[in-house]
Amino acid sequence: MMAGMKIQLVCMILLAFSSWSLCSDSEEEMKALETDLLTNMHTSKISKASVPSWKMSLLNVCSLINNLNSQAEETGEFHEEELITRRKFPAALDGFSLEAMLTIYQLQKICHSRAFQHWELIQEDILDAGNDKNEKEEVIKRKIPYILKRQLYENKPRRPYILKRGSYYY
């Protein structure tokens, strides 16, 4: 159990350092990077067949962070800010460990931001759209009443249902 958690932590640190552009010293730079990243993800054209690998790696990093947080919460109840501070780290923290902790904290903030969660939902909808498209069309066909179906087809002339009675019908 501990070996698996250590492997996850090492992988997360490697992924965090591979995306070094996400790390910054000041809060303003972090917010600017976050908004730039999220606007680029939201405005870029997304292929229905596949998602670019950097977006999926960011989603994987966020799921890995959430897995680490859920494992820490199983041992005891902590708040989000306390998860990093209450973990057992070496007594003598060097610069590398501090940078790793800062990187993990910044990635947590990006993953928990509302804009990223909104983008994640949009991404799931786009990936599932191909599978659900046929099902939705079938449901719509069953739910539309007869009159609404007739109004969809403008090419067909509409026949009167009630004929006026005239003197020549006797």
From Swiss-Prot:
Sample GO molecular function, one term? neuropeptide hormone activity
Coiled coil located at which positions? none
Expressed in which tissues: Brain and gut.
**Chain's role:** Neurotensin may play an endocrine or paracrine role in the regulation of fat metabolism. It causes contraction of smooth muscle.
Provide the species name. Answer: Bos taurus (Bovine)
Entry protein name: Neurotensin/neuromedin N
Site annotation (Cleavage) points to 160-162
Q: Where in the cell is it found?
A: Secreted; Cytoplasmic vesicle, Secretory vesicle
Q: A GO BP term, please?
A: neuropeptide signaling pathway
Could you name the Gene Ontology cellular component terms for this entry? axon terminus; extracellular region; transport vesicle
Tell me how this protein assembles.
Interacts with NTSR1. Interacts with SORT1. Interacts with SORL1.
**Principal cellular location given in the protein's record:** secreted
Endpoints of the signal sequence = 1-23
Against InterPro entries, the record matches this protein to:
NeurotensiN
Give the classification, highest ranks: Eukaryota, Metazoa, Chordata, Craniata, Vertebrata
**Keywords (A to Z) from UniProt:** Cleavage on pair of basic residues, Cytoplasmic vesicle, Secreted, Signal, Vasoactive
Q: Which gene encodes it?
A: NTS
Family note: Belongs to the neurotensin family.
